[in-house]
């Protein structure tokens, strides 16, 4: 695998782990720190490069990372959308919805950027933050000729997979 792909996966996976294990519902979550905390786990000669890439994502507007079909710019687009989307004071978990919409609005490889952002946002805010209307629209495909899997079934499968 390309070193950038490995580094991006390590950084994002560790940020997801941190969101799951440390994020408190009523406290601010430091998205940037969660991603930067993984720098010590990537190959040493890539750390400075990725530190700079994270800085670009944190300081640059989401639209700066288009086109984003490459792992680095997709990573930056997802992080930028998350960080640059305000967390609503009244309903903080609406940040998941708002940041995903921001990620998609960047354009280009929208499904990839939204999937990357959604993994970290979901880890932080939980399945309950997914808007009900989105769950009714989501469908998957079964392996053989049969009816599509509904959003509700996908949610049940996910909950069973994590033992919830």
Regions found by a protein language model. Give the residues of each.
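Catalytic phosphate/nucleotide-handling subdomain of diverse soluble enzymes
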Residues: 1, 11-17, 73, 77-164
């Amino acid at each position: 695998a390309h070193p950038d792909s490995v580094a991006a996966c390590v950084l994002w996976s560790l940020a997801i782990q941190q969101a799951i294990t440390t994020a408190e519902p009523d406290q601010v979550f430091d998205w940037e720190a969660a991603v930067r905390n993984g720098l010590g786990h990537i190959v040493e000669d890539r750390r400075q490069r990725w530190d700079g890439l994270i800085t670009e994502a944190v300081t640059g507007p989401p639209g700066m990372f288009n086109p984003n079909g490459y792992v680095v710019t997709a990573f930056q687009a997802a992080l930028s959308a998350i960080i640059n989307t305000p967390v609503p004071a009244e309903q903080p978990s609406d940040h998941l919805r708002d940041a995903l919409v921001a990620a998609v609005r960047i354009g280009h490889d929208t499904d990839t950027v939204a999937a990357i952002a959604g993994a970290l946002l979901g880890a932080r805010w939980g399945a309950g933050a997914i808007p009900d209307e989105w769950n009714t629209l989501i469908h998957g495909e079964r392996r053989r000729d049969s009816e599509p899997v509904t959003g509700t079934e996908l949610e049940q499968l996910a909950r069973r997979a994590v033992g919830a």
